Structures are given as C-alpha cells and as structure tokens.
C-alpha cells in the first residue's frame, strides 16, 4: 500500500484528527466530508474502530503499510508494552523529531526537509525520514539550508519542545535526549486498538 499523498484536510476530517499537526483542518468543519452536519458520522463496528485508529496513526506519520507493520512488529519484540513501544518508535523517527523540534510546520514538511538533504545527524547529512534516532544524537540544519524561509518561519512560530528533546534556536540544533514516554505522545491515539487490529 502506497503512502497517502492526497488531501490531508479531507482525510483529517474523515478520521476526526489533525494529520498536519496544525489543527486548522477541523476548525471550520469538524466532521467528515460529505456529511451535512457534525452528528451524522456513522457508528463503526469493533473492526471498523480498530482499522480507523490504525489509519489515523499511519496517515499522521505519513508512512506506508509495509513500513508501519515493520515498526509494529519490531515494537512487539521489545521489552515493555507493545503499543507504547510502537508509539515511541514512531516518535523517534528523524522526520518526527524534526517536526517536534519546530523546524517544520507540518509532518509532511519535516519529511520533505529530510528527503531534500537539509537535515544532519551528528554532523552527517541524513536524507532518510525513517532514520531511527538514538538518545544523545544531535539533529541540526545543514549550513547551506539555515537561511531557508520555511525553517526560519517554523522556528519563529514554534513555542514548545517536548521534554525528551532540547533545542537551540540560534544554532538550529537539537538533541534527542531520550526515548519519549507514552504520556508525552498524542493522547488522540488509542494504540491498543491497533494492537487488537493486528492480533485478529
């Protein structure tokens, strides 16, 4: 299954969650496209709820089904709670951290910055969005890319960096201090439904 590249706004409204991270998709019409009001959303079956939750998280991170399942299976081999491990692995991806550092306004934008070679890890350019960061690694913007308007505007508008990261706005440099705890990640996702989906 290919990575979703269609209308993020329509998909956000259908799933009831902001996939861009800005929340703007749901401000005017917080209900699915094609509906005539907020009270006409279909009641889903148990399977439907599980599938919807999987799609929410997959589209949120903008990854295809194969990548998503690979990370899920890897999380299952780790010590601890499967779902929490899964969420932590997703949040430890390079593109996810670039977004959380405030170097990009949206997750899609963060992925593009990585793809186009603007981001460095420990001084070396990394252009793989799925690159899994380890505690202590330093994320920075390539010198030639530091004057990009897209980055400057994002940093200026950013006002919060999670506690598992540190960020120096003057240097455009951040550190992945530690693996995030579940309580520090999206409360809009019920990962247990995803565990149940893949356990069917």
From Swiss-Prot:
Residues annotated as transmembrane: none
UniProtKB keywords: Ribonucleoprotein, Ribosomal protein, RNA-binding, rRNA-binding
Residue ranges of every copy of the S4 RNA-binding domain listed in the record: 92-155
Gene3D superfamilies named among the record's database cross-references: Ribosomal Protein S4 Delta 41, Chain A, domain 1, RNA-binding S4 domain
Keyword RNA-binding: yes
Gene Ontology biological-process entries: ribosomal small subunit biogenesis; translation
Entry GO terms, CC: small ribosomal subunit
One matching Pfam family: Ribosomal_S4
MF annotations from Gene Ontology: rRNA binding; structural constituent of ribosome
Stored PROSITE patterns: S4
Signal peptide segment: none
Purpose of the protein: One of the primary rRNA binding proteins, it binds directly to 16S rRNA where it nucleates assembly of the body of the 30S subunit. With S5 and S12 plays an important role in translational accuracy.
Family: Belongs to the universal ribosomal protein uS4 family.
Subunit-structure text: Part of the 30S ribosomal subunit. Contacts protein S5. The interaction surface between S4 and S5 is involved in control of translational fidelity.
Name recorded for this polypeptide: Small ribosomal subunit protein uS4
Organism: Macrococcus caseolyticus (strain JCSC5402)
Gene: rpsD
């Amino acid at each position: 299954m290919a990575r979703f590249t269609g209308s993020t706004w329509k998909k956000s409204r259908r799933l009831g969650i902001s996939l861009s991270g800005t929340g703007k998709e749901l401000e005017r019409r917080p209900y699915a496209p094609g509906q005539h009001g907020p009270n006409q959303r279909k009641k889903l079956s148990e399977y439907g709820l599980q599938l919807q939750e999987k799609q929410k998280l997959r589209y949120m991170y903008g990854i295809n089904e194969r990548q998503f399942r690979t990370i899920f299976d890897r999380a299952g081999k780790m010590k601890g709670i499967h779902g929490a491990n899964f969420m932590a692995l997703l949040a430890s991806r390079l593109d996810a951290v670039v977004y959380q550092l405030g170097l990009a306004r949206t997750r899609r934008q963060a992925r593009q910055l990585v793809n186009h070679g603007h981001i460095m890890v420990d001084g070396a350019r990394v252009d793989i969005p799925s690159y899994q960061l380890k505690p202590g690694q330093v994320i920075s913007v390539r010198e030639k890319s530091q004057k990009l308007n897209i980055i400057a505007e994002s940093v200026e508008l950013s006002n919060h960096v999670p506690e598992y990261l540190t960020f120096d706005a003057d240097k455009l440099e951040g550190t992945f201090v530690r693996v995030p705890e579940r309580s520090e990640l999206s409360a809009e996702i019920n990962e247990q439904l995803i565990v149940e989906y893949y356990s069917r």
